[in-house]
């Protein structure tokens, strides 16, 4: 059997789409909301089976990965998150790059020699890597309108991944991938797919509500926002953090969204002018992790909000 384990955001979706356009296969899809990255524990694979893992951290899957490799399962991995210690095993192949201007879809694009570049461009835009997206798009000779369409596609696919549970999402990420699968041409998906229209409309509604929320604390070096326990807030949290980062490139941003379970889910974006420190900040808190430019905390107790805010402004002090 073959399994595709992928992050449910734009980067995971577009990475998988590129791979399966290049290497068609019938596989079992294993995915979830964007923050559900401990996916290998959900896979019951046997000797000779194959797993393709995309845009999920090795570190968060270390124990099940070791067990699967010892059982004789072959695992290929593409990712841009901090991997921790990588296993050395003949059944394991990894392409990992944690540079701040790289996403998993760009790594897959590199692996495939640009065979399906437009999807990688969309994913890079979705990950708020605008400069990297434009560099990748340069050989495609796209118009400004086409480049804008890929940006909107990436942002909408990314938006669908955010939520406390699958019930918050417009589409289960596996179903959204199945909607992408018939389309080698990203522009055809944009023009024809009803799923894209649903995401575009939902994105506009949810972002309008998010932009109406005032900052809880704002300084020249950073801003903290607290969003309510509402499905729209959970869907908008990550994409609104990206939006704020783009609008204020010298400022860091943190969005704390109340979960139905009572804790807060945190999204952090380093300043675009200095894409570093987000992962180190979040890793100081249990359930925290991510990338240098963009990271998060899955469970922040309300009592620890003052500790987090203090650590945030210490990580991003005023000049």
Task: List PLM regions with ranges.
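Short N-terminal helix-initiation segments at or just after the protein's N-terminus
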Residues: 58, 161-173, 191-205, 235-242
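Short, solvent-exposed coil/turn linker segments
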Residues: 44, 103, 172-175, 179-189, ...
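Generic intrinsically disordered, low-complexity segments enriched for polar/acidic and small residues
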Residues: 3, 75, 156-159, 174, ...
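Oxyanion-binding "anion nests"
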Residues: 98-99, 179-226
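Loop-centered beta-sheet repeat module
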Residues: 133, 137-184
